Amino acid sequence: EIAQCLVGSEMCIRDSTWSACKGVVSCAAGIALDEGLIRLDEKIVDIFPEYAPENPEGYLGDVTLENMLTMTTGLESSLFFCDWPERYTTPDWIRYFFENAKVIKKPGTEWLYSNFNTYMISCAIEKRAGVNLLEYLRNRFFEPLGIGNPDWTLCPKGHVHAANGLYVNIDEFTRYGQMILHKGNYNGKQLVPESYMKMATSNLVDNSAAGSPGNLYSGFGYGYQFVMNPEAGSYRSDGNYGQFCLAFPDKDAVVTVMSLEGDFQKIGNHLWTTVVPEL
């Protein structure tokens, strides 16, 4: 286990995990599936009939929760999120999705990263559970991991951002890493069904579009909100500004990094040239 923290900061200081918390939403989906609250093949229009158009355009009516988990919704574009201007003028993000999502490709056929996929998965769980995702996971997930009263940014309607906005410290982030390393098990307690975690952390879809020149670690596949590493069988949660939680089951190792580095590819490349070879 290797934990690297912010220079000049204390281990107890919480900071944003940015998109690395997408893996937490995936874990929530696994728990909700096990409890019978949702199904992978459920269509998003059926979960939110009060929002869905009567005659969905394109392939919108075919989009399932599994498509959203794998980022293969078929969207034309990623839609807004985080600090995009629309965030400040849009009071209802679920309504925005159904009014603006152009699903031009058959769901399940092509990967396109969109924070809205994660947000809608979370909202579906919240609707079925009757509480927001933070409360749903409090006793089922966060407390067993020793993550007490975590902070998660809310949208104007009170739903967690889901795709980002979860604040933890690096010690808590590392415990999350231990849990994903052991396929949902932490300290002998199975928090997320093992069968689900095996699927979630498998290479399910081609995300080579995420690769870029000079990037040593992206574009090697995608699972249920988890990103595949170049090394076979290893995977991660990662986020903007250099948040990394890397799991290497064959080495029984977790590497966690939290940073505020604008050029987060520099951190990723450093991990794969300096840290990973030493595991």
Describe each PLM feature range:
Residues 237-279:
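Structured C-terminal helix/loop/strand segments within mature extracytoplasmic catalytic/sensor domains
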Residues 16-41, 68, 121-125, 173-179:
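Active-site SXXK
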Residues 74-154:
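A small/polar active-site loop signature that marks catalytic segments
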Residues 117-124, 164-185, 243-259:
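Active-site-proximal alpha-helical segments within enzyme catalytic domains
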Residues 35-73, 102, 129-164, 168:
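Active-site helix/loop module of the DD-peptidase/beta-lactamase fold
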Residues 1-8, 13:
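Single conserved hydrophobic/aromatic residue that forms the stacking wall/gate
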Residues 147-149, 198-254:
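Active-site Gly/Thr loop motif
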Residues 15, 19, 23, 38, ...:
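Soluble non-cytosolic domains of exported or imported proteins
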